[in-house]
Every structure is written in C-alpha cells, then in structure tokens.
C-alpha cells in the first residue's frame, strides 16, 4: 500500500496527521522556554509510540530499543495505564482505545493468573507479553508474586475511558468485563478483620524486598476501583454494587494519628531510611488515583513525604509527580523545584528524551529513553494534577476539583483541543483562579 501511494503522498499524510495531533499540545503559558520544549518533546514521544492501529499496546520505552539495557523488551506493565494512557485519552482517544484493546483481548490470561493464585476475577500479570498476555518475567522474585497493583491501574483506565468518551456501548460490551473482573478479584483478595477490610502481603510502588500489609497506594487504588465498579453496576443494573461499596468504604488505610499522615504501609515508621522508605506511595494514592481524604490529612501527608523526597527523587515514575503535590500545598517555588529535579533532570540533550533515572543523581545508569512512565508522568501532572481535573460520570464542567496553583512563573496551562464525550473542547487553567474551565469549540 505504501509503495502504491508513494513517498510524497505518505509524507503529506503524515504531516497532516501530526498537524491534528499537535492541536492537543499542552501549552505552559509564562513558563521559561525550556519547560515548553520539555512538554512538547514528551508529547511527541508519547504520540509517536502509540497509535490506533497498534495491537500490542506500547512498551516502557515506546518504539525505542536499547541493546545495552536488558529490561522491558516489549513488556506491557502498569506504567502504561497509569502514566501513558491518561494523556492519550483526552488528546488521541483512538490511540488510548488501542492500549485498552490490548488488555481486553487478553482477559483469559488474567483470569488464569488470578485462578493460579487462588483468587476470583481478573489479575493482570506484572509484565504482560504481547503474544497471549501471560507473565513474561521468568524469575522467582517477590514482586512477581506480590506486586499485583497492575490490575487496579488497568481497571481505572477502563473506567476513565468510559467517563471521558461517554461510550455506553463500550461500557457494556468491553469495559464492564474488566471492571467486574477486577472488582471480584479485589473482593476475593481482601481479608475482613476488626479494622475493616485489609489487603495483606502486597508490594506497592516502592518495590520493597518483602511484602507488607495494607500498602496505602494499593488500598487506595483498590477502593477507587470498587467504587467505580459499583457505580457502573448500578448504571447497567448489574449485581455487586452494595458489596463493592461496602468493602471500599471500610478498606483499611494506615494512618499515624500522632503525626497526622497516611503511612505507606502498616509497618511504616518515620525513622525508616532509604529510597524505598522515601517513596511517596501514599501521595500516589492522592494523585493520580484521586483518593480523597480530609484536607488537613492530605496537606500533612504531602508535607511529610516531601520532607523526605530528597532520598527518593531521581527514581522512576513518581518523581515526575512531586511538583503537583507541592503545588497542592500552595508552594509555587517548591513545585518548580520538584519538577526540575523530578523530571527536567531526567532529560537528555539534544533530543530531550526522558531517561528512566535522573541523569544528575544517577550518572552511571545507562542512557535509555524515552521512558514512557516519566514523560507520561510529567504530561499528566500538567494536564490533570495542576488543573485539578478528575474524570467521573458527572458533567465535564464538574471535573475540576481544585484551585489553580501553578509552579512559580507559570501563568496558565492551556490546551487548544481535548476530546471529551465526542466533542472538541479547549482547556484553560489560569494561575490563581478557583477552577480550570472547558470551552466547547
């Protein structure tokens, strides 16, 4: 087909396609030029690596291949649904749909995986292989057995797709089987105790060497999945809603009452040291999971983990979100500083590709990019975290939940075109305003 069309026609069609894609560019008004360059590069690498015609989702490095690096060769992991998918959802929904199709076409493997561990429903593997969706990492390591939160990211991605598109047919025919399956998996995974419902022996984002009880990120994400599944069950007049809401509302969250912060897990203490202890897992439950707690508890939890983030920043994924947490607490200078250390320091010139680890903090790590989780994390920080955008079944005008506090020097975040429920909208989030707004084209 390409030979028949000829090079010039293909080139013209490619330019036309990119002209449309760039209408979803995230504009950082007032920011120093390097920030816009970083945002544009991240946007390009993400959209260049995901397309509506893809049948294998995208891997941790998108289309890049690094022969000197032995990880993630075609593996599809939680990073995609958590960090890459949300930015695509509103700017290129067809590409986002393709990422979900990869999961929906491999639910049999997730069902077998859950059964193998003695659970019901769907448990997606930690590192999914494109051929049939089975686990592809052949190691006897704790995180393969206990790091199960990938299923929560997958389910929330399907819920977000339905909220953003309003596609009722997709909900009934595709999304529901995943949401119901993961909700049933959570139901069989929790243990009822005098404290409510608990998830024991889990490994979260920090990837400790040993599993912990009641990992804050895992429990918050599980509660969000159950509430989403319950809402859709009522919408479709299916069973399960009351049970799922009951578990979600009483899923135990470890809180240090004396210091007033959400603990990363049951055994977590403030005197623990090292990168794993400093990983802000509890904050990841606030964003991008959107688990709500009392505002005072949220603020003090953010303060607690940002005070320890020096030991963590430079590691993958959550580093790119640190600026959001500082902004939520009203620290504009801190937000800029954390984005610098949590994202800009990962980026390699001259092509502005984000590495897996910070080049400044870990100069001996191999140069490998563009790493989808980090660049996606920065994009969703700008598109969702700083604008207060939380997708839900409500009308789009009600999606914005927070006052606009941007990094120091940034005046606004604007996107000329986002796709919301089949229509094109313009996003405007101006520093100091009470809420961001969507304007229909």
Feature annotation, model-predicted:
Residues 50-68, 94-156, 162, 169-173, ...:
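Helix-terminus loop motifs that line ligand-binding clefts
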Residues 73-78, 86-90, 208-302:
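Extended ligand-binding clefts on enzyme/binding-domain cores
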Residues 268-275, 304-313, 343-348:
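Solenoid-like repeat scaffolds
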Residues 1-71, 441:
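Acidic/polar, glycine-enriched structural segments that form the non-catalytic walls/loops
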Residues 28-36, 50-56, 89-100, 151, ...:
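Structural helix-adjacent loops and short alpha-helical linkers that scaffold large soluble proteins
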Residues 72, 83-84, 134-135, 208-236, ...:
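C-terminal capping/lid segments that line or modulate ligand- or cofactor-binding pockets
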Residues 41-48, 79-96, 106, 152-168, ...:
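Alpha-helical support elements that line or immediately flank enzyme active sites
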Residues 1, 65-76, 122-177, 181-246, ...:
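The feature captures the catalytic groove of carbohydrate-active enzymes
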